[in-house]
Amino acid sequence: GNNIIRKLEQDADNEIRAFVLNGDSIKSLKKLRCKIYYGDVTKKETLSLIFENTDGKEVFVIHCAAVVYIKSKYNPLVYNVNVNGTKNIVDKVIESKAKLIYISSVHAIPEQPNNELITEITNFNPDNVKGLYAKTKAEAVKYVLDAVKNKNLNACIIHPSGIIGPNDFGNSHLTQLIKEVANGKLFACVKGGYDFVDVRDVADGVVSACKNGINGECYILSNRYIAIKELCDLICDVQGRKKIKMVLPIGIAKLVAPLFEVYYSLKKQTPLFTKYSLYTLSSNANFSNEKAKEKLKFKNRNMKDTIKDTVEWMNKK
């Protein structure tokens, strides 16, 4: 969210409103030009204030509030925020005659066999994807697209791949990985990889979608496949550390994943490797971003620059 605001505030004409969960830190929004509203997307009545005084204005609602979840244990909050929260946002957007840019995920799109190219789809089904997070994102997209067809909603959908980069005050599992490698605390990595995209490139694509995104259309914002070993090597290069030599096969990592989850839970940290994250690292990550490049003028920066900027941001924090 904060990276989108950083992009939006480059245009002095933009009036920016940020919706923050009650009790959440606003450290990520410090010194940013936005008016903060507090509430909870799962409680529709708390959304009223942020939608006030929008008559006669061109309004874009960028819905990026979500619970990204990679743990094995079921968590009802994931469904409540990702699905019910999205339904509430959709209802308010329809009422206010605004345009919705819904931030989904590539995880909402079914995996293709044999490393076949994965492109945008129009029919979403939670039963066709694996993991609680993916299922909730698929259900939410289905609701958004149904509202476009049946309730006169104006919306487009963004599917980012694995988001990585600076200004992650929420300390996601990828930021946790960079931190541990940069600090020399990780002595082994796992085989496999994924498509990782710079959060600032995603922010650029999202802002472009406000004006250029077509109603009812989906756009994949991806980059390229990057092995975890390559990612770790880039981090070590930036920090001037020795590269990690031990690479564990996914099968062995899956055996110890439950222990990792308990260990990080005790430390109150985001787990690096879970059963679901390991499944993801061995899944097909061959995503096409051609549509976004053509329609949204989407671009990717070099991953080395992403890692360099992220490590520098961490060191300044």
Identify what each model region corresponds to.
Residues 108-109, 132, 153-174:
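Flexible, glycine-rich beta-alpha linker
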Residues 129-156:
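Active-site Tyr-X1-5-Lys
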Residues 205-272, 289, 294, 304-317:
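Mid/C-terminal beta-alpha module of Rossmann-like enzyme folds, strongest
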Residues 24-30, 34-84, 92:
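NAD(P)H-binding glycine-rich loop region in Rossmannoid oxidoreductase-like domains
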Residues 1-2:
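N-terminal Rossmann-fold NAD(P) dinucleotide-binding loop
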Residues 125-128, 176-197, 201:
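A conserved pocket-lining segment of Rossmann-fold NAD(P)-dependent short-chain dehydrogenase/reductase
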Residues 139, 169-173, 190-211, 217:
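Substrate-positioning beta->alpha
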